A protein has these predicted regions:
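Cytoplasmic membrane-interface "Motif A"-like loop-to-helix N-cap segments
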Residues: 51-66
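C-terminal ends and interior cores of transmembrane alpha-helices
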Residues: 67-87
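Intracellular juxtamembrane helix-capping segments at the cytosolic ends
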Residues: 107-122
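A membrane-interface helix-boundary motif in multi-pass transporters
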Residues: 57-60, 148-170
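Multi-pass alpha-helical transporter architecture, strongest
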Residues: 76-80, 159, 164-192
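Extracytoplasmic gate region of multi-pass secondary transporters
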Residues: 1-43, 110, 141-150
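Hydrophobic core of transmembrane alpha-helices in multi-pass small-molecule transporters
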Residues: 88-108
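A late C-terminal transmembrane helix in Major Facilitator Superfamily
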Residues: 122-156
């Protein structure tokens, strides 16, 4: 779900923004670049908060990040679909806000899912766990969900439906990340 959101927005942002006549090709590239720059800052902030506030537990931070990412995806979808009617200038501003929200909050969970896998398995299985998280993240989240599912929905139905499917992916991400809170709490108690 995390990779679906990352790549569902990342892979399609320039095309989506141009086909919806929200931005020109040059403007959409700048917006996507800002999304990535803000994402780098968000990754650092997420790592810091995980260490300092949640004492190394990744799940609570992932839930928070995925929730705010969901809000960003919903804003992105609502502006693009016309649910939020706005002037072209306000539309671009709202898209920038949405892309910044998504960027800031999605790259933390992307980084932390691998760390989380390392923390939750025995040390002798750490490499395998990290490998599986990466493999399935890219195969299912990027290749299947982002490229095939989101792209197929955009072509077969509409961009509005495609972006709504990314929002559903973000919502699923919130719930999947929340499922690990108890496991991390129990692990922290057993290591104390």
């Amino acid at each position: 779900a995390v990779y679906m959101v990352r790549y569902g927005i990342g892979d399609w942002a320039p095309t989506y923004l141009q086909e919806k006549s929200i931005m020109t090709a040059a403007e959409s590239k700048v917006a996507f670049s800002v999304h990535n720059i803000v994402g780098a800052v968000g990754t650092l902030a997420c790592g810091w908060a995980t260490s300092k506030i949640f004492k190394g537990r990744c799940a609570p931070m992932n839930v928070i990040c995925m929730f705010f990412c969901l809000l960003g995806v919903l804003l992105y979808w609502m502006v693009g679909s016309g649910v939020i009617a706005a002037s072209p200038a306000l539309q671009k501003t709202l898209i920038y806000i949405a892309l910044c929200l998504i960027g800031f909050f999605i790259y933390g969970p992307v980084a932390l899912t691998g760390v989380q896998a390392l923390n939750l398995v025995p040390k002798n299985a750490a490499g395998t766990a990290a490998g599986f998280v990466g493999l399935f993240g890219y195969l299912l989240g990027d290749a299947v969900c982002s490229k095939i599912l989101v792209g197929g929905i955009a072509v077969g139905s509409s961009w509005d439906t495609a972006m709504l499917s990314v929002a559903v992916g973000a919502l699923i991400g919130v719930f999947l990340c929340a499922l690990l809170i108890r496991s991390e709490r129990n692990l922290a108690k057993s290591n104390a």
